Amino acid sequence: MVVGATPDEMVKLGFKKIGRDFPVFLHPKTQEEYALARIEKKMARGHDGFSFDFSSSVTLEQDLFRRDITINAMAMEDSQIIDPFNGQDDLKNKIIRHVSDHFKEDPLRVLRVARFASRFFDFQVHEDTIKIMREISNSGELQSLSGERVFMEMEKAMLTPDPSIFFEVLSKCGALEILFPELNALKGIPQTAKYHPEGDAWTHTLLVLKHACKLSISPEVRFAALLHDLGKAITPKEILPGHHGHEESGLSLIENFGKRFKFPNKILDNCLRVCKYHLLCHKVFELRAGTILDLLSGLDAFRNPENLDLFLICTKSDHLGKLNDSYPQAEYLNRCFDSLRNLDISEATKLKDPLKIKEKIRDLRIKAIKKVPREF
C-alpha cells in the first residue's frame, strides 16, 4: 500500500495502472502490485453504491478503519506491525470481528464474513458482528446484490474446508432466508427416523455437504450435495415424514436456483443428475438390470464416464449424511458400468435395421449387467 501519493505521481515513477475501479499499479521491475490508500463514502444502496477518495491526504489509519474485519485491518512497515484495531488479538483468539459500524454499508460483507468463517473453520464470528450482519439482513440491502456476485462468494465458500459453516453463519444472521430461501425452507422438515436419525432435512443437507467435502474438492460434487434434497421442502404435508417423489419435485427448484445465480452448466447439470437419480442408486440392489442400464444412460455415463464418478461420490455422501456405514451400492454400480465399457457388440453391428441394432445392444448390455455379482 502506498500512502501520500497520487495516481499521476505513481505513473511518473514508472508504475503501470491496472485497476479499473481502484488505483492499483504494477512495479516497473518486480511487477508487484501497489495500491493507493483510500476511503469510501456510501452514496447509494448496494455493494457498488460508493464514491472513493484516493487523494494523497488519506492516511493509513483512515484506510484501515474502512476495512471489513480486524484481522484484515493490519499493515506492516519496516517490519513494524501497525494494528490500530487489535487485529492481532483477534487473530490469536480466533475471532472474526468487524472494525466499525461502517461494516453495514456494504451488504457483500455478510457473505465475506460467512466465507471467512468457513475458510478458518476454527474461528468464531463475534456476536456483535452477527448482530450487525442481522441488521444488514433486515435492511433490505442484501436484495441489491446480483446473482453473479452472490455466486462468486458462494463458489469461494464451497472450496473451503467446511462450506457448511458458510450457510450456518448466514442462517444465524438471517441472511439465509433472504438469499437462499430454498435452503432455509429445509429447516424443520421432518424425515423418517429409521432412515434419517440425524434429524430434519436441513441437518441432513449440512451433513451430506460435510461428507462430500471430505471425499472431493470438486465444486460439482459439493454443489450437488448441497442441493440434492431441495424437493423435500415442498413435500405435501399429508405424506410427511416420508418424501415420495422429492427427487422429481426438486428438479425445478434446482433449475431456478441455478438460473438465479448463473451456475456454470457443468455444476448445474450434475446437481440435476444427482437430484433425479440419487434414490435409484441407494436401492440399486433391488433394481432390474434394465433399470440399472437406464440409470447409467440417464447419467450419460457412456459418453462422459466422469459423470458416474461425480454421481457416486454424491450418493455416498448422501448415505454417510444419515448412516455412518459402508456403501456397497457405489462399487456395484461401478462394476456394472465396467462390464459394459468393453462389451463385444459385434453381434449387433451385423444387423441392418438401426432400430434392431439398438435393441440388440440394449439386450447385450442387460445380459452383461445380470452377470455382475450382487454379493459384497
Predicted regions and their residues:
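Catalytic cores of the polymerase beta-like nucleotidyltransferase superfamily
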Residues: 1-376
